[in-house]
Amino acid sequence: VCRYITELIERGEIEKNSRFRGVQTAKIARLKAEAKCPVVGEIACGVPLLAEENIESYITLSREYLGSGKFFILRAKGNSMINAGISDGDLVVVKQQETAEEGQIVVALIDNEATLKRYYLDNRHKRIRLHPENDKMEDMFYETISIQGVAVKVIKDLQ
């Protein structure tokens, strides 16, 4: 029995449980891994709004759901990202990082104000284009911005 258990552990199908003498499937262990994400205020989905640095609360999410990295949560304010499925009041889960690929939705810090927009490089004019996902709004152009993170999930209240 010991040889079979060792073989299953080596293949990554089960994991030893350190709390007691037992094992659990690797999938259950991944589902149990959690990340405590701070809710740090509102983010403008329209005109940039000062992002609050104070932590309002924490939401615990599964690592299986998030993946690896450091995360924080902002509450969407406004309607500039409605075509991306982000509405006023939604919680946006953001992976904290300083770079982004074109087309990703980023939290951009501009003159100490944060906004949530789709990120593009305008190489011809050597500037950054932040695109609101709302046909009634126009793109915003900047020489420099500070990327605070990339939006990875949206938590909606359906009621």
Regions found by a protein language model. Name each.
Residues 9-17:
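A short, conserved structural fragment
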Residues 19-36:
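Short, cationic-aromatic polyanion-contact patches
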Residues 29, 43-49, 136, 153, ...:
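Active-site/binding-pocket entry motifs
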Residues 30-31, 45-46, 56-57, 80-82, ...:
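Short, catalytically relevant binding-site loops at active-site mouths
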Residues 34-72:
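Amphipathic alpha-helical dimerization/coiled-coil segments
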Residues 65-159:
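Acidic/glycine-rich C-terminal interaction modules and beta/coil loop segments
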